[in-house]
Amino acid sequence: MKGMDEYEKIINDLNTINSKAKFIGIKIIMVRRIIDMHKDNDKLIKKVLEGIKNTDLYDLVLNACPELKGERIKDVYFKKNDYFNVIKKTMSSENTVLKNVLINDESPP
């Protein structure tokens, strides 16, 4: 691991957890622990998030640390297709509440 940048080591650790841990609860706890160790370093967290964008690992990190969905990632670059993919997944899901919000601009109950 010599010569590895700190963000690369974090991504490597996160990948190891994701591939080795059997249960989602364990994965979430372990991922949360790693992110919490670096929570005060916004630049590093953003670099990690950019490095894992569009992967299952990205979704796992955001599930483990929902606070990263807000202000911290506002500067992370999102491609236009990301938005369309989210909308497409929502529209093809069975979640009628989300569909109503998207189509009719209704607020959830």
Curated annotation (Swiss-Prot):
GO molecular function, one term: DNA-directed RNA polymerase activity
Listed GO CC annotations: DNA-directed RNA polymerase complex
Disulfide linkage: none
Transmembrane in keyword set: no
EC number of the protein: 2.7.7.6
Ligase listed as a keyword: no
Reaction(s) catalysed (UniProt annotation): RNA(n) + a ribonucleoside 5'-triphosphate = RNA(n+1) + diphosphate
Keywords, in A-Z order: DNA-directed RNA polymerase, Nucleotidyltransferase, Transcription, Transferase
Described purpose of this protein according to its UniProt entry: DNA-dependent RNA polymerase catalyzes the transcription of DNA into RNA using the four ribonucleoside triphosphates as substrates.
Stated name of the protein: DNA-directed RNA polymerase subunit I
